[in-house]
Amino acid sequence: FITNSGDVNNVLNTEAGLKRLGVADATGIANYLGLSKEKVEWKTVNGKKYCYVNNQRVTGERQIGGNWYYFDGNGVMQTGFVNLGSKTVYYNSDGQMLYGEQKINNAWYYFDTITGARITGFYNLPGKTVYYGSDGQMRYGEQKINNAWYCFDTITGARVTGFYNLSGKIYYYGTDG
């Protein structure tokens, strides 16, 4: 940023200054949009995957090629569930963070479409309300939640309201559980 009149005269009044300012602006915009020309190199050592950006080993969270990855303190790419502060996220076998509804080890989960945070509790999906337990897994059948009984379809996980045949018995579930 130009903050004083001396910089205005030195930068804006010379061809070299304008060129330098243009490069700085273009670099800032490219970095902001994730379009920078970083040199990215992947290496596998003893079955562990590492990423180097501009010859520096990556640690922590990093967006590479439009996908988010997580590397531990030694730079090892992580997969599976990872606790990141106040949220739990999931990285697939390629190390990429997953979003939205995902089936993992035969269980359904939902991850926030922006942050990737695993969702727990009641959640509205298109056409149905479902419930994800404290472990993030979608619940089915009869469930006691906060001292109230709810029923969730045994196939879709959709919350049931009204009369419902559960194991050969007819039950009524109100809209409040």
Locations of the language-model features?
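Extracellular adhesion/carbohydrate-binding repeat motifs centered on closely spaced tryptophans
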Residues: 37-177
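Active-site-adjacent mobile loop/cap segments within catalytic or ligand-binding domains
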Residues: 1-37
